[in-house]
């Protein structure tokens, strides 16, 4: 979307990285600062979803508590998000202005003073937004589904890009993309998911150089229709990041 190319994402990532990992800031402040820096570097919303997913992971990874795993530390951090976190996260979302984000009443991001904990706001949004659902479930989609898919794919190919393509298609086939649903409706999101399922023979158990050509045709068709599975892409990035933080051999 927005006529973006790989350079937009690279510049946004460079700009956001220091803020995502800033140990002096709470989760909400990291989200806002990273989004502001990304926007200043590119002028468009390139990575709001990535920032929302990666900031809590980065904070959890830095917690000094060797007795618990990354997911447990993440769950504690998510449960402690407060009104300040909500205010800053909402400000970041308003700045990025993701497509199709309408007003929904309580917990609406257009509120400058949300007066509820960030995790409460995520509970209100979880049925229509998969990133909100991730906050509520301590990143269930990543830990229980996406990480195992990526790990299995890495065991079957030495080409990391093919493993990532496998992960992308598996997520697309498993979960309706929130970005498509917001912008074009649930029917459009469901149809994209079903098409990804129909292409299963081209990406299970792993994408190959030959099957990748078929998947490129699918990608071209989505672009022609203006359908951008942006939330799926956010989860791909967050899964790779989570795998690296977990110490899994992903690259």
Model-based region annotation:
Residues 30, 49-53, 89, 159-167, ...:
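Residue-level detector of well-ordered alpha-helical segments, enriched
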Residues 42-56, 225-241:
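Conserved phosphate/anionic-ligand binding catalytic regions in large, soluble enzymes, centered on
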Residues 1-25, 61-220, 224, 246-251:
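Phosphate-rich cofactor/ligand-interacting catalytic cores and adjacent structured alpha/beta frameworks
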Residues 15-67:
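Long, hydrophobic/aromatic-enriched structural stretches that serve as scaffold segments
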């Amino acid at each position: 979307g927005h006529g973006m190319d790989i350079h937009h994402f690279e510049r946004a990532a460079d700009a956001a990285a220091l803020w995502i990992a800033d140990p002096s800031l709470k989760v909400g402040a990291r989200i806002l600062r990273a989004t502001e820096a990304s926007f200043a570097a590119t002028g468009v919303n390139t990575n709001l979803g990535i920032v929302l997913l990666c900031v809590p992971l980065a904070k959890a990874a830095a917690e000094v508590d060797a007795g618990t795993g990354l997911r447990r530390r993440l769950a504690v951090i998510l449960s402690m998000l407060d009104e300040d976190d909500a205010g800053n996260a909402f400000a970041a979302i308003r700045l990025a202005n993701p497509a199709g984000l309408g007003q929904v009443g309580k917990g609406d991001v257009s509120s400058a003073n949300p007066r509820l904990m960030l995790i409460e706001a995520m509970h209100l949004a979880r049925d229509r937004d998969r990133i909100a659902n991730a906050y509520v479930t301590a990143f269930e989609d990543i830990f229980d589904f996406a990480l195992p898919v990526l790990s299995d794919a890495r065991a079957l190919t030495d080409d990391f890009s093919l493993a990532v393509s496998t992960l992308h298609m598996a997520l697309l086939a498993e979960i309706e993309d929130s970005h498509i649903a917001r912008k074009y409706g649930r029917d459009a999101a469901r149809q994209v998911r079903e098409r990804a399922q129909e292409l299963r023979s081209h990406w299970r158990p792993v994408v190959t150089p030959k099957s990748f050509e078929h998947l490129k045709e699918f990608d071209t068709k989505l672009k022609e229709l203006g359908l951008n599975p942006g939330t799926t892409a956010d989860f791909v990035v967050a899964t790779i990041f989570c795998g690296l933080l977990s110490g899994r051999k992903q690259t």
